[in-house]
Amino acid sequence: MVVGPGAIGRLLALSLQRTVQDSAAVSLLGRRTLPEQQCLETPDGKRIPLRITTLMEPSHAPIRPDMVVHLTTKSWATMNAFETLAPHLPVDIPLVLWQNGFRVQHPISNRWMGPVLCASTTEGAYVVDDSHVVHAGRGHTVIGHLNGHYREVAVQLAEQLSHAGLAATAVDDIEVRLWHKLVVNAVINPLVARFRITNGQLRDTPYSSLVEATLDELSTLMQALKVPAPPSTSLYPWHDLVWQVIERTAANRASMLQDLEANRPTEYDAILGPLREAAQTAGIATPQLDSRWQELEVRNNQG
């Protein structure tokens, strides 16, 4: 079952559905019912019609012995989705969390009796309409438990995703990888959203100096938290990581900007909140992060 029929949720559900004959094998649960007839458009432009079970009520979800629940909701909606769904599920089935930020992974892992794995992906997708999703670019997914447990489950799920055309690897250091992704998102998303620019424009004046200032704060914080730095041949591994992502995604418009323009809630709390709280605990000043938080908090409160 996939919970959250956004771009990644639908890409995941339809990709998994392609690998089986039974249209009821994969179900897609959301706050509104989508058409059961869906179209998955591949990166090379091929349109594949697929039939899938779509649901609104968790109590209607078919329970299967090999069931896995993938939570692909936005971070701010995930805890509510989990609490609504949990009473209807067998207590030992695996959950997979696909959220940005670092707000829900530990709380849900502590509350669920079964395996809770976290996934981080670079797959690209966007929704055309209620029955059409585009797999815009192939990426890679890593999946694992925060403490490195449930290795066999992680391997099985990675194999299942890879078989569905979504290249995946089971890892033992998913928490470190989530920290790395959090740093990237904390630098890029708020600045792109504030100035309404593409990722690549962060290379230009005056944005590049704000990128550097934010990276200086985050490098100090990651060192204080003893988070292993990403591989690098330079003395500035965190700077290298973020600038590489900016180069690679130069034409992209960050998800936080897309959310703002669509008048949707952003994931600013899940991305900036854990970093600011960790900095406060460590006694580290983060004026750049604080400024981004305040700007997004005002916009969020304005609706």
Predicted regions located by residue number:
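NAD(P)+-binding Rossmann beta1-loop-alpha1 motif at the extreme N-terminus of oxidoreductases
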Residues: 1-52
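Rossmann-like NAD(P)(H) cofactor-binding subdomain of soluble oxidoreductases
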Residues: 12, 38-40, 45-132
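Aromatic pocket-lining residues of Rossmann-like dinucleotide-binding sites
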Residues: 16, 108, 185
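Helix-loop-beta segment of a Rossmann-like dinucleotide-binding subdomain
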Residues: 89, 132-142, 193-203, 252-262
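Rossmann-fold dinucleotide-binding core
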Residues: 98-177, 181
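Active-site-proximal catalytic alpha-helix in oxidoreductases
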Residues: 175-219
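NAD(P)-dependent Rossmann-like dehydrogenase/reductase catalytic/cofactor-binding core
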Residues: 212-303
